[in-house]
Every structure is written in structure tokens, then in C-alpha cells.
Amino acid sequence: MLDKIEELSPAVITEELFGTGCVWDAYSFLSSLVRRAKHRIILIDNFVDERTLFLLDKRAAGVECTVHTRFSKQTELDFEKHNEQNAEIKKIQLSLHIHDRYLIIDNEVWLLGASAKDMGHGLCTVIKVDFTPEMVLSFLK
């Protein structure tokens, strides 16, 4: 009986490799991660624009969302206009010394090989890592 349940259950993907030009595949994968969130989403990504905000809007109602990024006047405007009409996405200025990108979905941490907005334009990987969200966030202070 357990074998049948395992056979019928979808496999949990913990890593994915996207080739150059696989923009839709990468976007769909990130979208599925965002939709899985029950409590919180935290994105750590130096390069965010309105495409990222559209992606994060796929989260369920009541899921808190925070983005750690470097923001320019345009990014500030994107967040301001977004938050006037949609569920708030909080923003926190990111240090210049942060290179890697992370997507935290509840208590899972995913390492992104490219910015969420650019995923699939070039070869990139998304992989679930065994860090706690608190461990990653502690390095942002």
C-alpha cells in the first residue's frame, strides 16, 4: 500500500537545472515554489524589478513577503505602486557585499543561480539547501 502511495505522489524536486532559453520552465518552477508558501516568502536578490513583483504576487492570501534587494529610484517606485494596489511586499536594502540569491519559502531555503527576473535566460540552477532561514538571514545584518 505504501509503495502505491509513493508511486502516485508527485516527487518533491529539490534541484533543477535550466538551460539557456528555458525562461518559461524556470519561471514556472519559481512560481510553483511561491505558490507552495503557507506563511512567508523572503527573497534575497540584488536585482529586482516589476517582473519579480508579479511572480511574488502568485503567493496565497495571507502569506507575508519580504524582499532584500538593492533599490534605485525605479525600484522604489515599483514597490510603491505595487503596494498601493496589491498585498504588501516589504523591502529591505541589501548590502553591496551580498552576491548569492536565496528564496526562502516558509522554512525551506533555495539557492538561486540567477536573479528571479533573469532565471532561464542563461544556464542556471535552483537548489534546495540545508541551511535554516535564520542562518541565512543572520548574515544580512
Specify the residue positions occupied by each region the protein language model found:
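PLD/PLD-like phosphodiesterase catalytic module centered on the HKD motif
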Residues: M1-A26, R36, F47-K141
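Exposed extracellular interaction/assembly regions and N-terminal maturation sites
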Residues: L30-S32
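Catalytic histidine site
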Residues: I41
